[in-house]
């Protein structure tokens, strides 16, 4: 017979822990009695009002008096004497000692007896309440006044700075409360702000590079720029800021801002730089341009010019100077062959003392020619390396004659090369302008002259192009508007007085509507072509239109007219012919009949 498997698991495989769970059973659940549900709910006791401290003190005093009276009455009734009271006091002291001993045992075991009844808990204030608001306000304060680096002396006086910071914040709050809010439509435009700032800004050239690297040199420059200001002027005149531009830095591997912070300037390229100085008022800027141009500061002549209204360039007072050095400290590389037959490159400086092109032109032409108004050395905008020529403009035309005599001369060490000095030509007499004029006469326009000149009719503009008339206000800001505001914004500002600009298609449609309204004959003249000239029928004249049927005016006299008229009505020659003969014959016959 085969073995049969039973449903009961073997005893060896039973887990004793699981078997212990089912060893004892509570039994089936018993239903609750009906009386449990029929009983009324217990009423909630109203909480007694919490008495104040004064009321509690008065109530405690009254309770003590009542209890003392009751104790005396009870003692007198029962007959307890002083001896009994002493025994009772001893018993109480013994019970207190026992309670203290039990309490120490409980504390050692770490068990605290629970009090009977529910314990009332007071709601504690949350320490992290309003945490987000505090964090955001702290971030706002950090954004308004970023913390800078503190020195040891500043750390010692930290409390004083905190108090000053709090006072300053209060002052700012009071000022902001006094300020009247302005609607965004009435707020000044960004372009207008730039123009207003340009009126207060002056341009400086041939500034010493020491002003970039040395703090004392920068202070000397600022002091010199503020030396001509009027101290009694209202509003007060002062120098607000200065910024340096077109500086030759040592390397192009890092941004210009980082190179400026590290003071890594390459004086071998050029010892001069440009700067912009912002004054508090336009009057101060005009005063600086009139009195500080050509003055000496940091052992260099500086050129001071207005940004909003730059000085005009007059070719009659300018000379062209060529054959100048490209960099101030030139190094010549010579390749030689040594004894072993190898090529060796030797570095040799052209001059022992480095040249200084821009300052040399100021000094030489100011001494030999006359008073110099400006010196413009043409350089590469990125590397600041010179292109070998410059323009010198004098205050007087007669100084040009003296400057031409310097042609072919050297002035070491600043100008060690032979100078090539010549007169400046008028813009329309330059080779480029003459070439463009010839191409225009032949019917071809060079690629560089095809684009229009900001709405002005130039060599590349067509006669049919619409050129709006520029207002006087737009002309005043057209000096350096593109450099200040950009091409797009400058065109908007210059053409701001025009509400709408019309192109060729718009003008063609307007002419068509006007011709249709006036009843002009478009069939005879043919369809209009955009950009073509207007036909005589499209012109609308005031008054009566002249025509050949109106006859001869009374005040019009022809050249061949005779003074003595013939007796006939025509006033001219007598008619001859068959018709005239018949008419005369008919007249004679008619008179005879009568």
UniProtKB/Swiss-Prot annotation:
One of its GO terms (cellular component) is nucleolus. It is found in: Nucleus, Nucleolus. Keywords: Nucleus, Repeat, Ribosome biogenesis, RNA-binding, rRNA processing. Its main location: nucleus. Pfam families: RRM_1 (PF00076). GO terms for biological process: maturation of LSU-rRNA from tricistronic rRNA transcript (SSU-rRNA, 5.8S rRNA, LSU-rRNA). Residues 111-135, 146-171, 498-507, 542-558 have a biased composition (Basic and acidic residues). Residues 57-99 have a biased composition (Acidic residues). Residues 200-309, 317-426 form the RRM domain. Residues 584-594 have a biased composition (Basic residues). Transmembrane segments: none annotated. One of its GO terms (molecular function) is RNA binding. Residues 508-524 have a biased composition (Polar residues). Residues 1-190, 440-468, 498-594 are annotated as: Disordered. CDD domains: RRM1_RBM34, RRM2_Nop12p_like. Belongs to the RRM RBM34 family. Involved in pre-25S rRNA processing. This is Nucleolar protein 12.
